[in-house]
Amino acid sequence: MSAKSRLIALLPALAVLLSACATMTPDECRQANWYDLGARDGMAGETLAKFTARRDACAEVKVVADANGYARGRDIGLRSFCRLENAAPLGARGGSYEGVCPPAIDYEFRRRFDVGYAVYRWHSEVDRIEERMRSHERKLRDADHDEEKAIKAAERDEDRRRIRRDFDEKRHRLREELHDFDRDLHRARDNLRDAEAAMYSLR
């Protein structure tokens, strides 16, 4: 197996080592293997803006980036990133696609990415609605305690009647909103199931 083939085989494992930062420290610049950096950035689907940021950071400490080595490594990384089977899972994780794949597969990669991203979007919507429902349910539970406390602090019957009326209206509003959330949740779950089915059909 050639060195290039071994690198391609190891790229999935290297993905976990991807740097979260675009810039580099002075020590990282001095010790950089630009071929490896290019391979890692390619595996992450980074645009050449990542190289520009690295190059500029290293220029500040008088280190010249190896543009050719980086480009060779990035090409290897992109070969792994641009596999069509990676597109939908990337979208489903909420990742981004910056159009870095070759024109011959860009359209299909983007289409599959969008199918996966629909899963992420609807999953996020389900989570958002469920959190709002939990918040409203907490408010409903707290309303009884808050009402009792406010009534005890009131000195006049008129004030107590107003407090009861206000809390009754609050509970009614919360229950109506919960009903709306429940309807929205069912619709979002249906859309999530459809999106998941569309993604699985790609396999």
Predicted regions and their residues:
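Intrinsic-disorder/low-complexity detector
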Residues: 21-203
